[in-house]
Amino acid sequence: VKLYGDISDEQSGRIFETAKSEFTRLDSLLNRYSSKSEIYRINESPPGSIRVSRELIDILKRSFRWRDITDGLLEPKIGHLVELWGIGSGTRKIPSHTEVDSVMKSIRESRLNIIDDTSIAITGDISLDLGAFAKGYAVDMVYN
């Protein structure tokens, strides 16, 4: 994090610590690889209803909006495709067209519905990865 402007070292230190704290908090909510995050818990859950935080509901709604705006390019249910390519695992690979088609079919068939302010329902084999969206959201939250 780089800070620019006419601010004291004390102010910049406070701003940096606040930003770091917010990034850490959001990582604990949205990191699909951390067993302590809500996203990880959803990805490991069987189909059915799941209780989640109000903040995650808001984030999911925003991610769905961006999925629609981008005609599916920012798909929050892309986790299995990320796994297929080995992204984040240290062993990346190029999957076959057949493998990609199979995973894409699973993504299209799975559903995540928001029930209320603290519940979602999943059907099918869902694997969320908010990746790019989460990074942008985190920067927005720190900026605010």
What are these model-derived regions, one by one?
Residues 132-144:
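Cysteine-centered nucleophilic/redox motifs
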